[in-house]
């Protein structure tokens, strides 16, 4: 992989991993436009840049993470349903690895965001801090997060929608979604390596790996901070609109044959 491509993919990962817009969809687009072969090194590269994004969350929220055991117990409660559901359905997920599924989930998720915001326009939120989240609510967020196993859904999008429906204010919904990414992404990465241990041996080009990792980390830190400030003042409707537009872009690319809805989606 060329260093410039590693930089661009690191930027894409950092920009989209924690925004409710589907990082998978953007990775498909970026990889295709750059003409990158989806080989074993690419899979290893993807794992490394995702680790950069995870480190970004830890960097931004380290104070909250070390305030006490309570937040970790809530994250455990949130991860539990995702982990259990993942173990049971993982072997069936390949059937969903299709570009048309991405199109449908991008558009559907965008519509849901818009409808939720319109329904909650003047509603008072019940949960205004991480400390107010109950273990039951954290568990429910984990159930919503498990929907992100469907390609194009967006892990952060699914968990944020769950938070909004449970009465979290926008910032708390986003913060808990970001924090829940830590155990979710670390364990998902470990599971991928367990299934394919050769992924580590394929990670032998240190310069592009380092560029991708550092870029994803720096961009993700900036995006997380910007996003939290943005949603403190505005709603999620712009992200809903963006998802719908992106969904129709993919629809055109697949329908016109520019992208292959089957093979090119299999990341």
Curated annotation (Swiss-Prot):
It is a multi-pass membrane protein. It catalyses: di-trans,octa-cis-undecaprenyl diphosphate + H2O = di-trans,octa-cis-undecaprenyl phosphate + phosphate + H(+). Its EC number is 3.6.1.27. Keywords: Antibiotic resistance, Cell inner membrane, Cell membrane, Cell shape, Cell wall biogenesis/degradation, Hydrolase, Membrane, Peptidoglycan synthesis, Transmembrane, Transmembrane helix. The chain crosses the membrane at residues 7-29, 41-61, 69-89, 96-116, 173-193, 207-227, 239-259. GO terms for molecular function: undecaprenyl-diphosphatase activity. It is an enzyme of class 3 (hydrolase). It is found in: Cell inner membrane. InterPro entries: UppP. It comes from the Bacteria. The keyword Secreted does not apply. One of its GO terms (cellular component) is plasma membrane. GO terms for biological process: cell wall organization; peptidoglycan biosynthetic process; regulation of cell shape; response to antibiotic. Catalyzes the dephosphorylation of undecaprenyl diphosphate (UPP). Confers resistance to bacitracin. Belongs to the UppP family. Bacitracin is thought to be involved in the inhibition of peptidoglycan synthesis by sequestering undecaprenyl diphosphate, thereby reducing the pool of lipid carrier available. This is Undecaprenyl-diphosphatase. It comes from Campylobacter jejuni subsp. jejuni serotype O:6 (strain 81116 / NCTC 11828).
